[in-house]
From Swiss-Prot:
Stretches assigned to coiled coil: none
Family label: Belongs to the RuvA family.
Keywords, ordered alphabetically: Cytoplasm, DNA damage, DNA recombination, DNA repair, DNA-binding
Name the record gives this protein: Holliday junction branch migration complex subunit RuvA
Gene name per UniProt: ruvA
Species whose genome carries this gene: Acidovorax ebreus (strain TPSY)
Length: 190
């Protein structure tokens, strides 16, 4: 299996890129979020990859972050979601938005992605719950590190994602961690 490619970016044609690794050119399919974060053609690039072998093709999918690759791996485990659909989901909303939609059980956000209907969205919410990593979900709700710490504390105290996210929204953006926890607990106790 090919887990990572590092080389020179030769071509960028969404959703495909061509990466030269010591004289061998690899065609890699990437999400649009990864595509927009790629360097200019001719510069060095490093992509985490997932190699998919099918009856009629061998495809290499590339990701800018480990979280995006993990989300892709979780998505393709779901019945009815193949690699192309998974890439479309990650292109349409990104990992943080996907994690937030799953934690808040918002099927409407998933339905906005081309190729995802209501039933598929509901299946995604059901099967992805708790699988995208707590840190990704926490960071999805938080605007900054202080808010992420406050949210993590609320989750550790036993509040669910919806309660903690609602309390976080009520806080000023520039609040400190200890003051934010106090204010959030006060609002949750009402």
């Amino acid at each position: 299996m090919i887990g990572k490619l590092t080389g020179t970016l030769l071509e960028k044609n969404p959703p495909e890129v061509l990466v030269d690794c010591h004289g061998v050119g690899y065609e890699v399919l990437v999400s649009m979020s990864t595509f927009y974060n790629l360097p200019a053609v001719g510069e060095r690039v490093s992509l985490l990859t997932q190699f998919i072998v099918r009856e009629d093709a061998q495809l290499l999918y590339g990701f800018g972050t480990a979280q995006e690759r993990q989300a892709f791996r979780e998505l393709i485990k779901i019945s009815g979601v193949g690699p192309r659909t998974a890439l479309s989901i990650l292109s349409g909303m990104g990992v943080a938005d996907l994690a937030q939609a799953v934690s808040l059980q918002e099927a409407g956000r998933l339905v906005k992605v081309p190729g995802i209907g209501k039933k598929t969205a509901e299946r995604l919410l059901l099967e992805l719950k708790g699988k995208l990593g707590a840190d990704v979900g926490v960071r999805a709700h938080a605007a900054n590190d202080n808010q992420a710490d406050i949210l993590q504390a609320l989750l550790a105290l036993g509040y669910n994602d919806k309660e903690a996210a609602a309390a976080l929204k009520a806080l000023p953006a520039d609040v400190g961690v200890s003051e934010g926890i106090k204010l959030a607990l006060k609002s949750l106790s009402k």
